[in-house]
């Protein structure tokens, strides 16, 4: 069933004078589906590169708090009788979790659309607006010789290296 939704992006504004920001979360409300949830950044690596000197642990703690508050609201909306009117926009809910003030975390103007999968839409918006420019983790590749050097030291220290013989294994094909 298609349902309308509204969303807002949570921005981290390091210096309100310059107005520079990085998107750090997304909250979404689909009133007819009685769905509300949020996704927030759980790492601060990119933020630390853009704004050196920020307190990463405090940031992560605050992101967990915001996301958990939206999860609590989502549970309440799904499981309780619909006695209270659900707001038509996500903004009143967003401001109930994080009020509009001049702090570093600010809600952007809301957007919206129609979806048949509010959860999937939230993930898509989060991917597009928050994690789009994140660097993929870099894994260090090592050659066979690099790996052998590490193990060789251990074998040498235990005086068992002389007992090892090379062996070539071939497949049955």
Where in the sequence are the language-model features?
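Polybasic/polar functional segments that serve as interface/processing modules
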Residues: 1-173
